[in-house]
């Protein structure tokens, strides 16, 4: 496995390759990331991973400065699993050698809802860096996790509408034994918070169970779930029941007709903001 830090070195190593599979990350890798790399290896060769903490997708009061930078540990994990051929680990100057005045803006009806409402500009930052990384790597396939459900949809729609020659593959959310979705930010949790954290996923499962039990009002499903979290001390940003196909709210007819849905939630446990989702 090789590690490169410049776009030129990246392109030199990939010259002539036309089956590249790509996994973009911000580093601080866990088993969820490594699962994406295993899926990438099934769909392309060589596998390229990027490690870059992208300032553009962090808001002014978010955790850009304290986000863990763990490149040596990340490299060791990838070397252990032997799924990755090339790691692209640029610094900020390499990715943004001048002010990034040209940016990729997702449509308001997808980019400004849910995560976009509570993290203004987040998806513009995501789309811009993903577009740049795809231009650098030029993969045939790229793999994203379903844990970031809205991000997956934004990126997939961007690539389709801009006719980028890349297939976006999705990997199911990887979870700990108690159901907590693996996340680089889980390390911020105290011992007591870590014990409480699986409740977020349990709450989403409760939404699916109530719908299966006959509840057809999405607002009622959202309200009960959000209140249950708040009663346990969570600070809830949103609990939303949406259509899987476009993240729009379902109407009553769609609820009764069995429309495929997804429940999405974001809430703070102490100082740590967690997100999760469940298709049903």
UniProtKB/Swiss-Prot annotation:
Subunit structure: Homodimer.
Catalytic site: 33 (proton donor)
Coiled coil (residue ranges): none
Enzyme class name: ligase
Associated pathway: Cofactor biosynthesis; (R)-pantothenate biosynthesis; (R)-pantothenate from (R)-pantoate and beta-alanine: step 1/1
CDD domains: PanC
This enzyme's EC code(s): 6.3.2.1
UniProt: ATP binding residues: 26-33, 145-148, 174, 182-185
Lineage: Bacteria, Pseudomonadati, Pseudomonadota, Betaproteobacteria, Burkholderiales
Residues binding (R)-pantoate: 57, 151
Signal peptide span: none
Pfam families recorded: Pantoate_ligase (PF02569)
Name of the protein in question: Pantothenate synthetase
Similarity annotation: Belongs to the pantothenate synthetase family.
Additional remark text: The reaction proceeds by a bi uni uni bi ping pong mechanism.
């Amino acid at each position: 496995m090789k590690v490169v830090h410049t776009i030129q070195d990246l392109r030199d190593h990939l010259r002539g390759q036309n089956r590249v599979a790509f996994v973009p990350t911000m580093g601080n890798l866990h088993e969820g990331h490594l699962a994406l790399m295993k899926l990438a290896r099934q769909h392309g060769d060589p596998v390229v991973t990027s490690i870059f903490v992208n300032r553009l997708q962090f808001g002014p009061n978010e955790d850009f400065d304290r986000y863990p930078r763990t490149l040596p540990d990340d490299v060791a994990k990838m070397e252990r699993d032997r799924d990755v051929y090339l790691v692209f680990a640029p610094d900020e100057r390499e990715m943004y050698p001048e002010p990034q005045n040209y940016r990729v803006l997702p449509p308001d009806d997808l980019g400004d809802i849910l995560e976009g409402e509570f993290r203004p500009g987040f998806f513009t930052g995501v789309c811009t860096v993903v577009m740049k990384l795809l231009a650098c790597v030029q993969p045939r396939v790229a793999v994203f996790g379903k844990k970031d459900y809205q991000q997956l949809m934004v990126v997939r729609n961007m690539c389709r509408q801009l006719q980028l020659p890349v297939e976006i593959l999705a990997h199911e959310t990887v979870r700990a034994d108690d159901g907590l979705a693996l996340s680089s930010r889980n390390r911020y949790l105290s011992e007591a918070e870590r014990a409480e954290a699986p409740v977020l996923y349990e709450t989403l499962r409760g939404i699916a169970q109530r719908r299966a039990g006959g509840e057809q009002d999405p607002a009622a499903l959202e309200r009960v779930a959000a209140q249950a979290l708040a009663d346990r001390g969570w600070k809830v940003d949103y609990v939303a029941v949406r259509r899987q196909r476009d993240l729009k709210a379902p109407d009553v007819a769609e609820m009764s007709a069995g429309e495929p849905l997804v429940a999405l939630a974001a809430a703070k446990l102490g100082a740590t903001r967690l997100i999760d989702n469940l298709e049903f």
